[in-house]
């Protein structure tokens, strides 16, 4: 029986707007013996919904998007009693998590690494019942990471967060 892989893609994430490189990744998974099902997210929270609803039926899950897509996918998988292994292809505007693991921004190269690797365990934190894999934040500039418009993040990367944070400077109060 063929191995199965659910490929969750956020088409709105920074670099995933060009699907050509993603086709190479899907082709690689197929060459490695996986029957691949591709699902594109359509709204915030959709990656979590897909991972939870469909994840148990697959041998492996791979998500492609930014840090938010990864976090959503992990959130959905954490609701399963026995989640399958997860691979991550960075496709967001800043990809902080991928940079911390030295993952390639090239989808085909990362796909090869996913299939060649035995994987590694990563810690998953939880705050108020919400899982996270990279960052849990609070404080003065937390809003900036959620409020920066996607189009600006796509164009400016990390600078978009800085510009969004400047908007809050006048509202800061000393403690």
Question: Each PLM stretch: what is its role?
Answer:
Residues 69-81:
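Short Gly/Thr/Asp-enriched flexible loops that form oxyanion-binding sites at enzyme active sites
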